[in-house]
């Protein structure tokens, strides 16, 4: 789903990034492991071990591996980078190399740090909604701000993680043409218009994580299916 490279061209998730993806993400995404752990904890507390879960933009399968270790057995991952999927642990999930959501009936959709690389977000969110059971849950993590002051604080966090200034500046330039940012308010209103109830469960400089429950409108009342 994601479009990274260490050269001067636009960011691509190539074999170089795939080989170090989790380490790279920990340095460049605020609270990367914390958000993943929240997803795993939520699944642990609210789903059966046989629930169907898909990780959209699964990269090398880090989240799926954690879910597998907790006993979940019907796990799926989709990513448009074959380099990522090639390095994912094949025994934990079924994987798809695609830029589309594989059609199925899901209990849980995880979509962390992926949609900001997709131009037509509404179309992809509609696909998620259509394939999510009533009462099902979407966890969505996105970059939601281009405010210069927020960017400055975000970059300061990268420096504290050991990322050098030149790497920060180069990656910012590489992402310019491949990352399409929308605001927190845009995500909330768009998701609510599709029948989700939305809560913010994590936020850091420029990034927001939403917990979205799919509900059904029947005779003037929202029913969750739970």
Predicted regions and their residues:
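A short acidic, Gly/Pro-enriched loop at the edge of an enzyme's catalytic core
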Residues: 101-109
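Conserved beta-strand signature within the Rossmann-like core of class I S-adenosyl-L-methionine
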Residues: 136-143
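C-terminal alpha-helical "lid/dimerization" subdomain adjacent to the S-adenosyl-L-methionine
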Residues: 143-193
């Amino acid at each position: 789903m994601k479009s990274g490279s260490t050269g001067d061209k636009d960011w691509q998730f190539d074999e170089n990034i795939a080989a170090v993806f989790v380490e790279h993400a920990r340095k460049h995404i605020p609270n990367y492991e914390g958000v993943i752990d929240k997803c795993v904890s939520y699944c642990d507390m609210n789903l059966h071990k046989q629930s169907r879960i898909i990780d959209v933009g699964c990269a090398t399968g880090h989240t799926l591996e954690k879910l597998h270790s907790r006993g979940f057995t019907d796990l799926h991952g989709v990513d448009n980078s074959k380099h990522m999927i090639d390095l994912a642990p094949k025994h934990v999930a079924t994987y798809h190399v695609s830029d589309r959501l594989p059609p199925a009936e899901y209990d849980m959709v995880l979509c962390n740090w992926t949609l900001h690389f997709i131009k037509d977000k509404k179309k992809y969110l509609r696909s998620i909604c259509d394939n999510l059971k009533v009462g099902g849950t979407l966890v969505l993590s996105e970059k939601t701000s281009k405010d210069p002051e927020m960017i400055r604080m975000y970059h300061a966090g990268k420096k504290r993680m050991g990322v050098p200034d030149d790497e920060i500046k180069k990656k910012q330039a590489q992402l310019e043409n491949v990352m399409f940012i929308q605001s927190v308010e845009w995500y909330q209103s768009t998701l609510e218009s599709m029948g989700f109830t939305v809560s913010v469960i994590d936020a850091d400089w420029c990034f927001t994580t939403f917990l979205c429950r799919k509900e059904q409108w029947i005779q003037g009342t929202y029913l969750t299916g739970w």
